[in-house]
Every structure is written in structure tokens, then in C-alpha cells.
Amino acid sequence: MGCRFCASTQGGRVRNLEAGEIAAEIYGVMRDTGERVSHVVLMGIGEPLDNFDNVMDFLEIVSCADGINIGMRNFSLSTCGLVPMIDKLAEKKLQLTLSVSLHAPENTMRSSMMPVNNAYPVEQLIDACRRYQQTTGRRISFEYSMVRGVNDSDQTAAMLAKLIRGMGAHVNLIPINPVDGSPYSASEIGRAHV
């Protein structure tokens, strides 16, 4: 999706994984560790909602009683904010946690870091999150990478609080890691503990 502070996007997209390939990762971890996997986070290279059908099939495979039987509340699905797909996911009424990579509370700032914001501006994204929450009854988790001098001011924090007020959301403040070739650096240590 081309997020400019993310090392995962530097290799470019090759293809989406099939449902069985995603499930094979879980089974591989269980085989290698000898332990049952109880929680799954769909995040990292790729956009889960851009691979919707395979992700839904994967969830069915590993959550069913004949599979690993992981409870749906033990899944977290991350998205950069594909608004139509958030609405489509809401229709499924799954009890997973939706983690939204927000990273900025206003459009100019978010677009400079995340090109997807040009297609789905902050206001549309937050409206979709509110619809998701109303439909599923699930709290949204907002991922917010702290970038020095870009999105870590007190004013930006106040804008973020105003933007999501009344949602009962969780905000995960994440100091970014250094990425070769990126103009971004992590906020000072204390900024992520506002």
C-alpha cells in the first residue's frame, strides 16, 4: 500500500497469499513449537482487506471446530483503511478486533505518510470505523506510529482525541523503527506515553 514509513512496503507487492498458505503459516508455527496457536494478528506485508476472500476463507479454516478452533475474538485484522472493505467486513459481523493504521488525524499529514488516504480520506475512514463498531459491537483499535516532528505534537494528540471521541476506541502509540531510505525517525521516548 506504499506507506512511506514502513519497511514492509519496500520490496513491493508480489501476490496475495491463498487461504491455505496463510493457514499453513499457523500450522507451521504449531509444528515447530509444539504449542497450540491461540491468537492471530493479520498484519505486516500486504493488506488483509485487499485479499478479502482468502482472508475470510482462512478465518473459517482456523476458527472452525475441525480446524484449530481459535475463537474469533482472538483474531486481530489490520487495515490501512480500505473503506469499502471495512463496510464489507462489518457485514460479516465477525467478533474479531479491527486494527486501523491511522497514524494521523488529518488528511494532509496522513496523505504524506499513507497514499491510501488520497482515495479514502480520514473523515471517510472514521465514518466507516463508526459504522463497523455500530454493526459489530466491537471496539476499534487505532494503530498510531509516532513520527518525530510529523504527528507527535500536543496539538496533533488533541486533534486525534477529538476525531475519535465517543467511539470507545483503543489507540496504540507505536514508536517507529528506523527504516533505510526513510526520511522519518521515531519520536522522543516520552512522546509515546501521552
Where are the predicted features?
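Canonical Radical SAM [4Fe-4S] cluster-binding loop centered on the CxxxCxxC motif
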Residues: 1-20
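Conserved AdoMet/S-adenosylmethionine-binding subsite of the radical SAM
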Residues: 23-39, 44-190
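Conserved small/polar residues in nucleotide/adenosyl-binding loops
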Residues: 192-194
